[in-house]
Every structure is written in structure tokens, then in C-alpha cells.
Amino acid sequence: MNFLRKIVKKRKDEDTQKPSPVSAPPDDDDLWLPPPEYVPLKEFTSKKNMRNFCINGEVKVCSPNGYSFRILRHILRSFDEIYSGNHRMVGLVKVVIGLTLSGAPVPEGMNWVYKLRRTLIFQWADSRGPLEGEELEHSQEITWDDDTEFVGLQIRVSARQCHIQGRIWCINTSSRACQLWSDMSLKTQMSEEDKDSSLLLE
């Protein structure tokens, strides 16, 4: 009888050790990070180089075996080298990617889709940033693989200037978005006139 108990116990131990099938992006390699916070539009002291943009962002992660944010962060660290869009708006694209990937993904077949739709305020330092009235339609595919894993990122960002009341994009410096911006080397500086606002340097 003891022998049978040992066999049953051993089988139970084996069952608990088996990895469960991947049904959601694994997040065991990430500390939980709070979502970004948005500050409603207010009166800015400085009006220079300020633009209100209606944003649509989508990042589709294609991976047959699931993925971790460690891999996504690894891919995004080389973003400056692989970005193929309008370089006057690369800072805006980085902001949108970070905010998009901070949301909750929706499964779509073997893919995971992150989406963002929002009106955001952007301020650029000096004479940087897009031209007046300039819009952006950017799509790009980035793939990464080694002997064990394949991950593809399909990025789409559209931005058009609009007059809908917007929000400052983020003040929560401990959010995942800020972690991803750091990985992409987003260049910003704090606004001297508006303490809640960051000026884009790219």
C-alpha cells in the first residue's frame, strides 16, 4: 500500500512540474509595473512647438510559442538602427509604441495584438519635430529569431494633428512604457515652464 502511495505521489509531483501550455504571454521574467498615467490638457505656459495628435497605434506580436517582454525589450533596443519612417517623428513613434505595449493584448490566432487610440499632446524642443500640418502613416515589420524562438513585430502608427482636447502622454516614471522608452533610447528633457511635460528631442 505504501508503495502505491509513493507511485501516486510521484505521479502528482510530475504533473505539477509539467509546464502548462502557453495560452498567454509569459510574464514571469517581468516585475509587475503600473500602467502609464495621463494628465488632462491644461494651460501650458510654453506654447512653442506644441502639437495635438490623434494617435492610432498597433503592435502585433507574432510568435508560435508565446513570448516574453525580455525578447520584446531586446528587439526594441536596436530601434534607432531599424526605424524606417519619418525621422522628424521618430520620438512620437517611440512614445506610441511604449504606450501601446503597456496595454492588454488581444489574442488573434497565434498572434497577440496591442492597440492604442488616443489624443495626445506632444512638445518638441527647439525646432525639432514634424512640420506644421505634417501627418504620419508608418508601418514596419521587425523579426528576431534564434535556434529556439521566433518573434515578429508588426508595428503600425498613424498620427494626424487635430483640435480635440488631448492629454500629456505620461508622468508615471515607473510604468512599463517608461521602461520601453529607455530601451529605445527615447530622447527627452523636462520642460522648464511646465513641470508635468517632457519635451521631445527627436
Curated annotation (Swiss-Prot):
Pfam families per record: Rhabdo_M2
UniProt-annotated location(s): Virion membrane; Host endomembrane system; Host cytoplasm
Single GO biological process annotation from the record: viral budding via host ESCRT complex
GO CC aspect terms: host cell cytoplasm; host cell endomembrane system; membrane; viral envelope; virion membrane
Compositional bias annotation for Basic residues: 1-10
Motif (PPXY motif): 35-38
Topology class, membrane: Peripheral membrane protein
Involved in the inhibition of stress granules formation and contributes therefore to virulence (site feature) positions: V95
Keyword flag Membrane: yes
Main location: virion
Entry GO MF terms: structural constituent of virion
InterPro entries: Rhabdo_M, Rhabdovirus_M_sf
Stretches the record annotates as Essential for glycoprotein binding: 115-151
Alphabetic keyword roster: Host cytoplasm, Host membrane, Host-virus interaction, Membrane, Phosphoprotein, Viral budding, Viral budding via the host ESCRT complexes, Viral envelope protein, Viral matrix protein, Viral release from host cell, Virion
Superkingdom of this protein's organism: Viruses
Keyword Membrane: yes
Region Disordered: start-end pairs: 1-33
Family designation: Belongs to the lyssavirus matrix protein family.
Subunit annotation: Homomultimer. Interacts with nucleoprotein and with the cytoplasmic domain of glycoprotein. Interacts with host ATP6V1A; this interaction plays an important role in virion uncoating after viral entry.
Protein purpose: Plays a major role in assembly, budding and uncoating of virion after membrane fusion. Completely covers the ribonucleoprotein coil and keep it in condensed bullet-shaped form. Inhibits viral transcription and stimulates replication. Plays a major role in early induction of TRAIL-mediated apoptosis in infected neurons. Inhibits the integrated stress response (ISR) in the infected cell by blocking the formation of stress granules.
Domain comment as written in the entry: Late-budding domains (L domains) are short sequence motifs essential for viral particle budding. They recruit proteins of the host ESCRT machinery (Endosomal Sorting Complex Required for Transport) or ESCRT-associated proteins. Matrix protein contains one L domain: a PPXY motif which potentially interacts with the WW domain 3 of NEDD4 E3 ubiquitin ligase (Potential).
Miscellaneous section: Most abundant protein in the virion.
Protein name: Matrix protein
Organism for this UniProt entry: Rabies virus (strain China/DRV)
Higher taxonomy: Viruses, Riboviria, Orthornavirae, Negarnaviricota, Haploviricotina
Gene this protein is translated from: M
